[in-house]
Amino acid sequence: MSKEEVLLRIQAVLDQVLDAKGIPRVKLSEDVAVMDGTLPIDSLDLAQIVIELQSVTGRDPFRNGFVEFRTVGELARLFAA
């Protein structure tokens, strides 16, 4: 899965999360910070996104411990082939 495909998947899961919360959708870009308050998500929402990415890509970049990432683009690169 390319980085662009991963970004689209992140957007799709984020849309589902926000729809379930009744929060307006947010358009992502690679430079959007994940957990600084820019996105209206919490750590459980982020975990849901990560689990979905692991499922669709077959990758687990966190297998050996936490890998730091700050932006949506950095997260996408962790899962891109």
Where are these regions (language model features)?
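Phosphopantetheine-dependent thiolation modules in NRPS/PKS and related acyl-activating systems
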Residues: 1-41, 45-51, 55-81
